[in-house]
């Protein structure tokens, strides 16, 4: 959104410059002809309006020629107070106006009237807040934070003000094609059935030495209070972690080349083929029931956790590793009859059968060969061999439109989404159950928020007390907690999550600085302390309380003491420039 605003402002400035070159501005909308004017009144022209952007109650000067008979100035349909007037300049006070757009500036018409004619010129009026309409509710938008958190990745915090249903919304926006950026689901403690706090997953996975897990959100719904089983399926590194309990659920899909998709996935029934005989498997990584054959891998735990009533066979791939959408050749390593709880060696799997299904395994011996296959089919894309998938529920946003999958209750919510060209990934958490701060949203409202951010496709993840967003070295006391679950700081342990990973080495050298606050809002005569982050070349925050920053501000706006700004001037808005060792950042200031 910040980039869109900058692009919009640049286009506006170019347009204003083109208008300033023009000698006159032609009359429009009912302006009377030059000929036959009453009392021989001379035509007047508007050359420019300066400054180019101001806010309500600021003074603006309309420059031109022949204003002697001008008696009224309107901004859209609202009359402005004239401070002074001459033949070539009219000074007016901008009237109070309501922003009607989802932007900090809105193009309005400035009309200067004389007794018999008027001239009109477009003007970009600056507003302290944009206005966003969510279904039938109008919200005042305030961007509280916007800063980098990793390769091609930014965190944005937005407050949507409303008397009855205020909202606090958190976004992580990521350039999928950014260098050194990977995406990966995380299983709680790397084992099915466990739970773990999202804010602990990032540091734990980073400590394993496979990149910096710098940002993520909670994942799938799970059997809370029971066995904590994931409900909608998950795969990691070409291994099935858990099969979905429903078909055609929404999935975040990560391909080997790093491409990401959101689509509804269907799983074929897993099967093994031995000696030309195909045997369907009843489950993967689930408790074995009577007359079943089940495959277990290391995500289930160290052993199969079975009794001694069946047959178990340890198998390993003959080449490479386990994979999805492929016939994976395997070799029997060892067999166990009437013995359970078999250990699952690294890189291997265990086939376990009871009752009528035992015969298939009883016929096997060490060295025997076979193949394993499970196919994942997407509804809208031709998938090759996905590396990771995270299943959730059906899509809430598809092709830029909310779907019929709706939960109408307002709750804290979590969402994952992609832009239409799949170049931008969005993680979102909306706080809820937070009195007077954030009421939560329905799934349709969540879909519309994702669409406003830029997503064309999105789904709803586990919400309520599970909704958690993490970003490395920022947030609450540097813990990475970006939102406030149920309005507090307690984070629920969850079964899995989805993370962005920076495939870079540690580097504490500061290459850029960023303000923790996107906008400073302060009352006249009052002060506001500023906080800055040190950002390395990969976009990661390496110092979350940077002190050696020099600040500069126009005296017309206020004064600086250390890292504190005081609104002592008459100017109502402007910027503070922060500089450190040749790198700088700017912070908006609004004086109320």
What feature does the model see in each segment?
Residues 31-135, 585, 589-591:
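Ser/Thr/Pro-rich low-complexity tracts
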Residues 33-40, 126-348:
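Zymogen propeptides
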Residues 77-84, 552-564:
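Low-complexity "stalk/linker" and mucin-like segments enriched in Ser/Thr/Pro/Ala/Gly
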Residues 92-97, 560-575:
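Extracellular/luminal low-complexity segments enriched in Ser/Thr/Pro
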Residues 106-112, 571-580:
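A short beta-strand micro-motif common to beta-rich folds, especially ectodomain repeats
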Residues 224-254, 387-420, 424-455, 466-511, ...:
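Conserved, well-ordered active-site substructure
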Residues 526-540, 576:
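Beta-strand-rich structural segments
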Residues 538-557:
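Short flexible loop/turn segments that cap and initiate beta-strands
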